[in-house]
């Protein structure tokens, strides 16, 4: 769903990407056969990077009014990049890594009146009774390529546990993408 928000509200048709750096050819073939025509696999080599061909079609918009999806995107941006946003501490000032996200916290059990009076912090509660921490995001904000969802069981709040982890993952993913692009560019200029 996060990817659908990032792309402006269009339904997404999943596809499989092969990467020559993955050494699990048999697993790839087995998984791929569930999704694509076997004849495409017969013509593919495991050492090449390629995108499995699929039929391009007009994707259906999820929302009739594009202002609605823009409102959600702006709210996710504010949640991460504005001073009082719930995941503000996890943001990057560098525009290259700027992302939009939303925190979430899920109760594991009912909180009793007696529990409320104790006013316990998550760290003071038995592990199995602590809240689950959630965070969804897409990045980079201006030109989204990635969406991420982080769930940490019994992690406490989304802003303290899940958002910082998502932030680190987003930075690593973008850096890896840039490194891959640079490697491809260098290989082409040497050839």
PLM regions: where:
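Hydrophobic/aromatic hotspots within intrinsically disordered, low-complexity regions
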Residues: 35, 40-41
